[in-house]
């Protein structure tokens, strides 16, 4: 292997956001029930049961502090319908050039969300991507920190702060493409450690998910049962300013709670 490309990506790693060395995970340290952990240890920052009507299709039409980031791209198309206490999302992804993206203020280092949701079965590839954002973070694309992504077949947990959304990583990929260089296999292997995929078959029933970050770990539970946990430095970011979710087609949200533990 030519030493110079490897040296270049090692130097690139030095430009990624500095974080303390990851502590070893204590044996059996994670709570067995993250819903109970949030409720017992956390402060409820926000709750919405969507018992109202939307006021229009614009940025703030959902009300109660929510913002629909893609609404103003297609003001004549309704992407959110508040119906009988349910936020029914129907993303106009093709028309907007982006999946429906809805967010609300959060504000914690450790904490998380409890969300009651349902895939209504109106489209084949319904998915739900939810996680945390810090738009004040300038070295990560749009401040995207970390996400859980529910598809019809699996659950993905991903650290985007030190992974795919890091601007230094994006620059390396762009530079490699411009120079017609093959991706460095060691660098790509490092990036793969930022993501974990767990098989999880979707259905059309109502479920309650819990997504938390605690230090270097992000955990996902469904109906009170742990499904997946992943450790990566980006999860330890000290300010998750927004709770954010995206949908590529249709998903229904019945209840959202945001908790701060630290």
Predicted regions and their residues:
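Flexible glycan-contacting loops in extracellular carbohydrate-active proteins
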Residues: 230-258
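Short, aromatic/His-centered strand-loop micro-motif at the edge of beta-sheets
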Residues: 164-208
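Secretory/extracellular carbohydrate-interaction modules
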Residues: 89-177
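Extracellular carbohydrate-recognition regions
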Residues: 25-65
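Short tryptophan-centered beta-strand motifs in secreted/extracellular beta-sheet-rich domains
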Residues: 50, 115, 205-214, 218-220
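Short strand-turn-strand beta-turns centered on an Asx-Gly dipeptide
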Residues: 221-227
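Beta-strand-rich interaction surfaces with strong enrichment in secreted/lumenal proteins
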Residues: 35-36, 99-106, 194-201, 242-243
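Short carbohydrate-recognition loop motifs
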Residues: 74-97
């Amino acid at each position: 292997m030519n030493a110079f490309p490897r040296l270049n990506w090692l130097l690139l790693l030095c430009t990624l956001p500095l974080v303390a060395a990851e502590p070893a995970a204590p044996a059996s340290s994670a709570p067995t029930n993250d819903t109970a952990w949030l409720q017992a240890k956390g402060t409820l920052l926000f709750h919405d049961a969507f018992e109202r009507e939307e006021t229009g299709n614009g940025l703030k039409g959902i009300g109660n502090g929510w913002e629909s980031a893609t609404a103003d791209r297609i003001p004549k198309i309704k992407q959110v319908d508040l119906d009988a206490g349910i936020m029914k999302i129907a993303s106009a992804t093709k028309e907007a050039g982006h999946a429906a993206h809805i967010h609300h203020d959060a504000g914690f280092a450790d904490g998380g969300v409890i969300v009651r949701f349902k895939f209504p079965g109106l489209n084949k590839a319904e998915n739900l991507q939810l996680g945390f954002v810090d738009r004040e973070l300038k070295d990560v694309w749009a401040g995207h920190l970390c996400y859980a992504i529910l598809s019809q077949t699996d659950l993905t947990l991903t650290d985007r702060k030190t992974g795919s959304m890091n601007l230094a990583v994006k620059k390396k990929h762009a530079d490699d493409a411009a120079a017609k260089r093959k991706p460095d296999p060691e660098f790509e292997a490092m990036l793969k450690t930022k993501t974990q995929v767990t098989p999880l078959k979707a259905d059309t029933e109502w479920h309650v998910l819990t997504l938390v970050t605690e230090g270097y770990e992000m955990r996902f539970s469904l109906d009170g049962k742990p499904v997946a946990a992943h450790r990566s430095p980006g999860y330890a970011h000290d300010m998750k300013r927004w709770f954010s979710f995206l949908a590529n087609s249709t998903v229904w949200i019945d209840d959202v709670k945001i908790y701060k533990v630290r």
